[in-house]
């Protein structure tokens, strides 16, 4: 697909697998989505998303392969798409992202943006760029916001994954990952 770029040093396709997982959409309807992930992480990710689904406490707007967005991380984030594999470097570097190995998942990027100072990505995530705003939006009933004490963070951490919302120099609220190498 369009998210696999051998010229960038992507891992072999045989190290990746298509995973179908359950989730509740923003209207609360049960549905399924697709994530391309590392074979080595597939079982634990299936368990994590099943735990989140079973809690019925967290909602995801959409979950489609990044190929649908031409392999563009920006287009996928702007569509508030939850995704995993995308062979790309860490923004602003030449180092491959954990996404390039199928070892990272971004969930509801609009409600859970990347934030460094006044920079917010995607831009539509600006109403959710600070913890007080995030908590207020959740209190108003906005679905899909990842908070430290919530079901999504608990499920990922319980299964050995880390959360970008815990970082101190910047926040990546959408980002859950395993160490790549």
Annotate the PLM regions:
Residues 1, 28-32, 87, 136:
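General secondary-structure edge motif
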Residues 1-11:
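N-terminal low-complexity, Pro/Thr/Ser-rich intrinsically disordered segments
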Residues 7, 31-34, 93, 142:
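Residues at structural and domain junctions
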Residues 9-77:
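Active-site acidic/histidine clusters and adjacent loop/turn architecture
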Residues 9-11, 86, 181:
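Sequence contexts marking disulfide-bonded cysteines in secreted/extracellular proteins
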Residues 20, 31-32, 50, 82, ...:
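Residue-identity detector for threonine
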Residues 59-101, 109-114:
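Active-site-adjacent loop/helix surface patches within enzyme catalytic domains
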Residues 89-181:
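Catalytic cores and adjacent binding grooves of peptidoglycan-active enzymes
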């Amino acid at each position: 697909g369009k998210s696999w770029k051998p010229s960038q040093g992507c891992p072999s396709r045989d190290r990746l697998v298509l995973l179908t997982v359950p989730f509740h959409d923003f209207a609360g309807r049960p549905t399924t989505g697709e994530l391309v992930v590392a074979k080595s992480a597939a079982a634990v990710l299936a368990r994590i998303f099943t735990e989140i689904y079973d809690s019925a406490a967290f909602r995801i707007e959409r979950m489609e392969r990044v190929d649908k967005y031409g392999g563009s991380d920006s287009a996928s984030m702007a569509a508030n798409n939850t995704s995993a594999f995308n062979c790309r470097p860490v923004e602003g570097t030449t180092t491959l992202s954990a996404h390039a190995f199928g070892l990272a998942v971004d969930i509801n990027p609009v409600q859970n943006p990347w934030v460094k100072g006044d920079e917010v990505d995607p831009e539509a995530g600006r109403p959710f760029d600070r913890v007080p705003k995030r908590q207020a939006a959740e209190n108003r009933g906005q679905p899909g916001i990842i908070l430290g004490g919530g079901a999504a963070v608990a499920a990922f951490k319980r299964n050995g994954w880390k959360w970008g919302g815990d970082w101190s120099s910047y926040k990546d609220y959408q980002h859950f990952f395993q160490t790549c190498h």
